[in-house]
Amino acid sequence: MRAVVCTRYGPPEVLRVEEIPTPAPRKNEMRIRISATAVTSSDCYLRGLRLSPAYRIMARLAIGWNAPRQPVLGMVLSGEVDSVGPDAKSFDVGERVFGFNRHLFGTYAQYVCWPEDGLLSPRPANLTDEESAAIPYGGLLALHFLRRADVRAGHRVLVFGASGAVGTSAVQLARHLGAEVTGVCSTANVGLVTSLGATRVVDYTVEDFVDRAERYDLVFDAVGKNKSAGPLRRRREVLAPGGACVSVDDGTPNLRREDLVLLGELAARGEIRPVIDRTYALDDIVEAHRYVDMGHKRGNVVITVA
């Protein structure tokens, strides 16, 4: 099968498309023929080990010291169950699915074997594979952190980085939970964030959200503290009494299959929609990583595989 292989950490150019053996599912696995995947910011951080020194050591211990132990990166997919092991009962051959393979990687390829208890769900019938692949990463992370902050109807939520993969999901999911949402983004993305349901949008190139009169029950950093420490340094100044600040890189999120199912149901009903900035072919994976590395993508960057 064709796959993107990463044999050392470094810039996008370390990625190569190669022919490698097609995996066979073990007893408790399913093999999925992948139609689409996505390049997430996490993929790029891991490929380049662009992390703080402490996190870099932890990442090397977890995924490989000099190179990823699993040379095929990629965390999300949409595709079709191609083969099942004898003990895998959750999905049938031919079933269309989408999912998030966070710790095992392997989705930059034509096929991947997926554990029976992995984060996999039936694909929304009204969405394309490209749209479905754009849901799991931002959707699951945003849902985890909004729940962690106990966002409820009537809460006022500020989403910093509202136009990225996590941010676009956070705006929509916070609105679904009944919150009043303020999004922070650049001029070019004001229209997008407004269309996703934000009540107010702050253009950070024009004004500082800290200078506004509003106070919030939650300030959600959907970018990550390493990248947004400067703009968010004064974020506690805008908190309402009892309010909280959370960041997408605050600890290890608890990602659950039932939440992926929920995201699929919300997308099927049109209550949330995946946002796709650009779509690349698998052969253009280096260019896709270069684009994500720039840090200005709107929503998701999707890769077509099949």
Features from the language model and the residues they span:
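Glycine-rich beta-strand-centered segment in the early N-terminal region that forms part
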Residues: 21-38, 52-103
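Short glycine/proline-centered loop/turn elements that form peptide/ligand docking sites
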Residues: 85-87, 181-192, 209, 226-227
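Mid-domain Rossmann-like dinucleotide-binding core that forms the NAD(H)/NADP(H) cofactor-binding site
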Residues: 93, 132-203
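N-terminal Rossmann-like NAD(P) cofactor-binding module of classical short-chain dehydrogenase/reductase
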Residues: 98, 219-220
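A structural motif shared across PLP-dependent enzymes of the aminotransferase-like
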Residues: 103-116
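A short acidic, Gly/Pro-enriched loop at the edge of an enzyme's catalytic core
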Residues: 211-219
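Glycine-rich phosphate-binding loop and adjacent beta-alpha segment
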Residues: 221-275, 282, 305-306
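C-terminal capping/lid region of NAD(P)-dependent oxidoreductase domains
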Residues: 271-275, 289-306
